[in-house]
Swiss-Prot record:
Protein name: Small ribosomal subunit protein bS16
Keywords linked to the UniProt accession: Ribonucleoprotein, Ribosomal protein
SUPFAM superfamilies in UniProt: Ribosomal protein S16 (SSF54565)
InterPro entries membership: Ribosomal_bS16 (IPR000307), Ribosomal_bS16_dom_sf (IPR023803)
Organism of this sequence: Phocaeicola vulgatus (strain ATCC 8482 / DSM 1447 / JCM 5826 / CCUG 4940 / NBRC 14291 / NCTC 11154) (Bacteroides vulgatus)
Family per similarity comment: Belongs to the bacterial ribosomal protein bS16 family.
Transmembrane segments: none
NCBIfam families listed in its UniProt record: PRK14521.1 (NF011094), S16 (TIGR00002)
Compositionally biased tracts (Basic and acidic residues): 149-161
Disordered: region residues: 149-183
Skewed-composition ranges (Low complexity): 162-183
Any GO MF annotation of the entry: structural constituent of ribosome
Record has Flavoprotein as a keyword: no
């Protein structure tokens, strides 16, 4: 039986996530499978992979052919690095302990790079949020200035109107006070 390691689609419309499965070559994409060895969610940044490393290595060593995407996932997770090192052990190039040490060094280097990437993404997200907040504050200050100018103009117009009305009202009162004095 020819086997493939491939992705099986799950999730709703426009939000796909995948199960990594071992399936017969002739089985349909979302059909019958032999074993589920992990999940892959491309919607997160960076993509989230949950993989049963031992079973994936077992199936790769048995000759299961991965699809292109799964091959990239397995490569990033280190399955192919481990296979390469085990091939070196089988040929006698180095011992299994040396192979394990090389694999751990590679894995630690990979994880530190991933942590750096996540930190950089978080920093960029914080900087973007801060820039948005500053821009919003600037816009709010401009709006507040315009509102203050408008209120000041309205107050000045109201004061002028009151000033214009006040002498007009005082003038007849003054005339009224002068008239009884003459009489």
């Amino acid at each position: 039986m020819a086997t493939k390691i491939r992705l099986q689609r799950n999730g709703r419309k426009s939000y796909a996530f995948y199960s990594i499965v071992i399936a017969d070559v002739r089985a349909p994409r979302d059909g019958k499978f032999t074993e589920k060895i992990g999940t892959y969610n491309p919607n997160t940044n960076p993509a989230t992979v949950d993989l049963n490393f031992e079973r994936a290595l077992h199936w790769v060593m048995c000759g299961a052919q991965p699809t292109d995407t799964v091959r990239n996932i397995l490569s990033k997770e280190g399955v192919y690095m481990k296979k390469h090192l085990l091939g070196g052990v089988a040929k006698g190039a180095f011992t299994e302990a040396e192979a394990e040490a090389k694999f751990e060094a590679w894995k630690n280097n990979k994880q530190s790079g991933l942590a750096t990437l996540k930190a950089k993404l978080d920093e960029a997200k914080k900087a973007e949020a801060k820039a948005r907040l500053e821009a919003e504050k600037k816009v709010n200050e401009e709006i507040a200035k315009k509102v203050a100018e408008k209120k000041a103009a309205e107050a000045a117009a109201k004061a002028e109107a009151e000033a214009a009305n006040a002498p007009a009202e005082e003038a007849p009162a003054a005339e009224a006070t002068e008239a009884p004095a003459e009489a």
